[in-house]
């Protein structure tokens, strides 16, 4: 018996089976749109979205993803996310969002010669 077969036998049946059809009705699928705010401070931007929220998240780009005030999220495209008090840059597949970045990001400063 191979290791793969041993792992499949060790997994409980409820992990291997498909969820019943009625299980999805409690958590409906999110429909495409510009920006939707969900309770608890979670912001969601969906495909083709360009948008901003006051005191929340501003993001420009494609594919859908969800961001919380401190989250690490998988994003299949390139873009920039901004959180009040912090900045997040999305490059490739991972975005880290949080206020801990705010001390490392500063605005454009003028030279003394200007």
Curated annotation (Swiss-Prot):
Keyword annotations of the record: Membrane, Transmembrane, Transmembrane helix
Record's subcellular location: Membrane
Signal peptide: none
Region (Disordered): 1-33
Transmembrane segments: 40-60, 78-98
InterPro entries: UPF0444 (IPR028153)
Family (UniProt): Belongs to the TMEM263 family.
Described function: May play a role in bone development.
PANTHER family: PTHR31443
Protein name (record): Transmembrane protein 263-B
Gene field: tmem263-b
